[in-house]
């Protein structure tokens, strides 16, 4: 008979089991077995931690490269009909005067993108004015006028009928006119000229338009109010109507408005004041400040990436890799660095002269970061901005506007070609050749795609012409477009090598996380099994010990 079983409750991993009777340290045995099961998970967790550090670095790298690409985009001429043009297509108006007059006090200018650079001599002789007339003086603005009739009010070809009743005051007449101002082009206001005198003021909404009034029925309201004389002429004219008059390069022109957008192609003028004594020079040219701003933004974006790259290449004097160099030896990082180095050290021939970034005052420092001599840059932009445009942006010329660039990608060879394009009755291209070679393009409807490996690879054209013709084209890629496309091979969200490297790491982390979960589940199951096993073993030993003690007791009593 077992009088008592001595035991100890032991808790491991939130599971309680019996220990202490057998002399075995079952807790240690279970822990050792569980740790052996978990050992592969610890290896995987360490790898996941490393992979997540790499992924974080990849994300930072992608962000820095995307910022760099944004600056290149502004300098390259982004492909596509709906895309933003490069900064080299931006235009600015530069104003000066032949005397001390400040041009901005007399007119403002807005210039459309890609407007042809040129200059004009402008004189502003008079501004366009809006017609303004008034009634005779009235003794009250609130008393009933006692007038009953309908009159027509308008400007140009627009008019509205205004109905006046006998109980209406001067204020009511004003309100009735303003209720129809959108239709008539005339607004009304009341001017108090003394303590007891008021006049109704009629103002044309647009300059260069004369106000017209005529009686339609009933009393002649305009004559009774003193707006018109009995011969229907204007009685009280506060401001005459006149056109704007200005001369451009000695040619006098008139407009009915002070906002003029049909005088110089691509240019909108807003006239603020007349000055017959001053001649203003309007120069349309590249927006030098915008170009410089984008070039400096490119330098800043490159230097930000360069700082990142240096951190991940850092090795101390003993040859030990820095803990922060997460991407040390990474193929993607090495590839991007090589692409940038090669591109930034390239040269470009423009009109037989070879240029580099150094020509613009953009050079490398001792750490291979870019630095800018702004004095050199300013001078080069001022004297050679067209050269900078050719250096940086994709440029395309065609003698037929029906052949347009639809898209482009990759590294594109510069060249000039005469395309013999054959078109059927439905407008589809049936053939295209260059100097008799018909193997350069693939044809799909009215789309031409440069064959891979050919000198026109990467180019896609669309032809909207309806007749067969020969089209002469030329194109050159430029530094910004070339480097953008190189970086896109890494950052492209579909198949860029950086994107694919991130995707592979993410998949490895996902697989490892799943495997860790499986290992932990298996280890937990093994722990439960061992706990049960040792608990049963302890119980059996306890019973055996109790039986042994009982037998010893019987034997002793027999003695």
Regions found by a protein language model. Give the residues of each.
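Short amphipathic alpha-helical leader/targeting segments
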Residues: 65, 136, 264-265, 316, ...
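Short amphipathic alpha-helical segments with coiled-coil-like heptad repeat character
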Residues: 59-60, 129-137, 310-313, 542-552
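Acidic/histidine-enriched alpha-helical segments
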Residues: 193-198, 311-329, 333, 529, ...
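Secondary-structure transition/capping residues
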Residues: 41, 62, 79, 184, ...
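Long, low-complexity, Ser/Pro/acidic-rich regulatory segments
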Residues: 513, 520, 531, 541-552, ...
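Contiguous, amphipathic alpha-helical segments that mediate oligomerization or scaffolding
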Residues: 45-76, 299-301, 305-321, 326, ...
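Bacterial flagellar/type III secretion structural subunits and associated motility module proteins
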Residues: 1-49, 70-199, 203-304, 308, ...
